[in-house]
Amino acid sequence: MTGDVRRLPDGHAAPALNPLTGIKLVVLTGLSGAGRSTAAKCLEDLGWFVVDNLPPGLLDTMVDLGVRSGGAINKIAAVVDVRSRAFTSDLYGALGVLRNRGTALRIVFLEASDDELIRRFENVRRPHPLQGDGRLADGIARERELLRDVRGVADLVIDTTNLNVHELRGKIIAAFSDDNQPALRATVVSFGYKYGLPADADLVVDCRFLPNPHWVDELRPLTGRDDAVREYVLAQPGAQDFLDTYSKVLGTVVDGYLREGKRYLTLAVGCTGGKHRSVVIAEELAERLRRLATAESRIDVQVAHRDLGRE
């Protein structure tokens, strides 16, 4: 088996919004251990409202929740797995109701070879949910049989046998990414070391190698948002060299993030109090990040000044 994606003839890259409900629904199912959790997390990163282990009979309820949200929830991904012998009939019944309502829905089925599933379960030292007192292979075989008909009606089948996590994410992104959604969301946050590092930082830049405007009387009451402080900081020896050099580092990091399917980057830029130097450098690096965007890989860059105003 290979990492192939099979589509039914009428399959599409993503379901269209239905004019009646305004809701897109993806039913994510397949064999245990085939990567449902990874696929669900990827959909969540793409902006889908993800519900795990949802009984088929509650699919209609979830769509109603989306309708009542007034547009706050318009993309729902429901992870559905085998829990009973009635699974298939319950799922078919629920899908029939949704289709009669005109809901735009799509079924995604994940699978892998028996040998690969056995290897994955043995690696995590967990039993198969349908194994009972029998062998692991028996549980896999039983689940495969229970889901055979569901696989047959799936709009998208992904064989994850030879896929790593990043490759699976890539396939999900290719199938469900909104064309208007950026490839990477980057947040550049300035901070003061005296208040501690931002807990969610992926990269940290220390600006304390630059002279501190705090010791310049006329600049002390100002912030890095003021032109006088900005000009002072950027005129210091090493400031431009640092920005040019670190911009190249960011280019390498962004390329790697995109290759690995990572969609979020937080860059923390620090100085002593988070008032002058870090604010200037954060704004400059944010602009450099924006320049890294291409037509194929749009980057959404936000700037936050965490400790500005604390002094």
Curated annotation (Swiss-Prot):
Family: Belongs to the RapZ-like family.
Gene Ontology terms for molecular function: ATP binding; GTP binding
Residues the entry annotates as binding ATP: G30, L31, S32, G33, A34, G35, R36, S37
Physiological role: Displays ATPase and GTPase activities.
UniProt keyword terms in alphabetical order: ATP-binding, GTP-binding, Nucleotide-binding
Name of the protein: Nucleotide-binding protein Acel_1111
Binding residues for GTP: D81, V82, R83, S84
One Pfam family of this chain: RapZ-like_N
Keyword field contains GTP-binding: yes
Top-level taxonomy: Bacteria, Bacillati, Actinomycetota, Actinomycetes, Acidothermales
Organism for this UniProt entry: Acidothermus cellulolyticus (strain ATCC 43068 / DSM 8971 / 11B)
Entries under InterPro entries matching the protein: P-loop_NTPase, RapZ-like, RapZ-like_N, RapZ_C
